[in-house]
Amino acid sequence: MVTFALPFFMIEVREYVDAKGRSLYRDWLVKLDAATIARVIAAVLRMEGGNFSAAKAVGAGVSELRLDFGPGYRVYFGKDGEQLVILLAGGSKKRQQADIEAAHMLWNEYKRRKREK
């Protein structure tokens, strides 16, 4: 009998907290209803397991996790290496361009603060 073991590792997911202690992702998430929050968290948990099938790059190191329900929710994130995801912001399809611009700004801030440590 031959068995095969696939390498398995979890992706660490963290929220980005700015210098003032704020998380744009958290600020967005807590405004949603409980059922929507549960679906967003389930999607983020799938990313922890390595499932990025609903993600699409939006430039400058930022990607969006597309959630196909409601108004087309999005979670914006950056990958810091292979095993760390930084949640930057959330939004909907309606505000997509403004949310992408905010996520780019936060990602640049994250990288700058990381270099300064």
Positions of predicted regions on the chain:
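Basic, Lys/Arg-enriched alpha-helical interface segments
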Residues: M1-P71, G81-V85, S92-K117
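Short, surface-exposed beta-strand/loop micro-motifs that present aromatic residues
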Residues: R74-G78
